[in-house]
């Protein structure tokens, strides 16, 4: 039996960190959630929303997922579309248990261990009233003889959520955008970095960037996934090897001349905390470094 300890560097979170988090995520975000397999095959696409409500005068936030169960499109100019939705509570947290890392106009949740034993990592970048979230899962792979601790984590399902703040969602509709990927030229702007090993409340270091090239290619052991019509792409490790840093990259072009890029270095399967003949308990995965670049074409 394998168990991965689920842990994160929490503790008291300064009010400034809480404000940065709510400024970035509060509200109801509607859009299209596209789920791809590790080979890039589109597995599912749905209309959904995420609502983060922050209690007045309290450092408490409640998270709710909203799924469209049925929709009816009007066939006349003076009529309205209608839809039925289902809501699913997705937990709550307070300022002193905030697990999000905030870095410029981006954030990261995880890496963390799910009940299934898989590792999950969520990355998000925001531009105006729009954002893109990426959630990637990695499943443990056993050793060659099937005994002992796993030697790697294999990339599984990946979900891109292209969303806009309600009520602006009707006007923005990220899923209908046509912003093909275009990395040509050089780029300049700012880069926010949380140095290793960051705590959720850490302050990002800001540096200027000029003459940067944004060519995005998958490495030999990496997978390039993209939604070209929405200007979204990601380079993810096909496998995360035990105790070796792995780089996850999310890029988004909300306009032809604007790019947001989030790069996260993570580590998993670090060391065996407890190991017996029947079970192995591994140290939790951790975020080593987080960088968010906000760039414009020169």
Where are these regions (language model features)?
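Soluble ligand-binding/transfer domains with enclosed cavities or grooves
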Residues: 14-298
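N-terminal chloroplast transit peptides
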Residues: 1-12
């Amino acid at each position: 039996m394998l168990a991965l300890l689920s842990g994160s560097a929490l503790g008291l979170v300064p009010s400034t960190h809480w404000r940065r988090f709510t400024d970035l995520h509060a509200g109801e975000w509607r859009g299209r959630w596209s789920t791809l397999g590790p080979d890039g095959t589109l597995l599912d696409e749905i209309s959904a929303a995420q609502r983060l409500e922050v209690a007045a005068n309290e450092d408490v936030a409640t998270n709710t997922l909203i799924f469209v169960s049925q929709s009816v499109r009007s066939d006349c100019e003076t009529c309205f579309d209608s839809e039925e939705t289902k809501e699913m509570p997705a937990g709550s947290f307070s300022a002193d248990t905030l697990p999000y890392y905030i870095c410029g106009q981006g954030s990261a949740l995880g890496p963390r261990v799910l009940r299934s034993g898989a590792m999950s990592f969520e990355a998000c970048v925001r531009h105006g009233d729009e954002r893109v979230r990426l959630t990637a899962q990695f499943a443990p792979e056993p050793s060659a003889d099937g005994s002992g601790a796993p030697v790697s984590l294999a990339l599984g399902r990946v979900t891109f959520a292209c969303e806009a703040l309600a009520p602006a969602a009707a006007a923005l509709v990220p899923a209908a955008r046509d912003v093909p990927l275009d990395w040509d030229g050089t780029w300049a702007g700012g880069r926010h970095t949380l140095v290793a090993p960051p705590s959720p409340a850490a302050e990002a270091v800001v540096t200027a960037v000029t003459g940067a090239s944004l060519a995005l290619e998958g490495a030999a052991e990496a997978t390039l996934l993209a939604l070209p019509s929405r200007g979204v792409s990601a380079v993810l490790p096909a496998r995360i090897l035990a105790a070796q840093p792995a780089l996850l990259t999310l890029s988004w072009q909300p306009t032809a001349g604007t790019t947001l890029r989030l790069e996260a270095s993570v580590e998993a399967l670090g060391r065996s905390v407890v190991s017996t003949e029947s079970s192995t308990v591994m140290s939790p995965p951790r975020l080593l470094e987080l960088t968010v670049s906000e760039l414009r074409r020169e």
